[in-house]
C-alpha cells in the first residue's frame, strides 16, 4: 500500500498465486514456489522473445533457424540480463526487459504487418507504466519507428500510426487501473501518474499526427524531418508547461 517507484501490479501478480496456494501447501511453501516460478517463467518468455527476434534477423538471409539457435545461446550467456531472472527476483527489471524485447519484435515486423506496431506500442506503454526505466525504452522505440518512417514512409506509415495508438491507449488504460482518482492530478515524476500519462499521450499523439499530415508536408525527407522536428518540439514544450515540477529529474517531487 505504500508509494513505490515501480507499479504495484507486479506485487499483485506475485501475491495472488501465493494467496491461492497457501490453503493447499502453506504460506511458506507457497512463497518458495513463487520465488522460483515467477522469475523462471519470465525468463522463459524473455528467451522465447530473444529467439523470435533473432529469427527475424536471420530470415532476411534465409537463415532463420540458425539465427534462432544463436539467439538462444547468446540470450543464455547474457549474464547482465538473465541474472535479473534469478530465483527470488521480485522486482520490475525483468518485466522491463521483456517489454523491451516485445517492442523490438513488433517494430521488426511492422513493415509486413503494420498492426504489429499496436502491440509494440502496448509493450512500451506497459514498460512506462511499470517504472521510470520505460521512458528511455519509449523514446528509443518512437525514434526507431520515426526513422523508419522518415526513410520509407510508404512502408512504415501505418505501423507508426498503430504504434502511437498502442502507446496512448495502453497508458490511458493503465493509468485508470493503477492510479487512484484522488491521485490523478498529482505530479509524480518517478512512477505512474499524470506526467507518465502525458509522456505517452504526447509521444503517441505525435506518431499518429505524423501519418495524418497532408502529403505536401511529407513529400520529401527534408519536409518529413521538419514536420517531425516541429511536432516533437511542440510535444516536449507542452510537457514542460504541464509538468514543470518534473523538469529537475525523476525525484523532483
Where are these predicted regions, by residue range?
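Interfacial loop-to-helix junctions that mark the boundaries of transmembrane helices
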Residues: 32-34, 88-90, 191-197
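Membrane-embedded helix bundles of polyisoprenyl
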Residues: 38-60, 64-150, 163-182
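Membrane-interface interhelical loops and short amphipathic "cap" helices
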Residues: 25-29, 82-87, 182-192
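Transmembrane helical cores of multi-pass ion-transport proteins
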Residues: 27-32, 74
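Extracytoplasmic/secreted proteins, especially bacterial periplasmic and envelope-associated proteins
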Residues: 8-15, 36, 40, 49
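Transmembrane catalytic cores of multi-pass membrane glycosyltransferases
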Residues: 96, 118, 123-253
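Short linear capping/connector segments at secondary-structure termini
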Residues: 1, 30-35
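Short hydrophobic/aromatic helix or loop-helix immediately within or flanking a transmembrane segment
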Residues: 1-27, 127
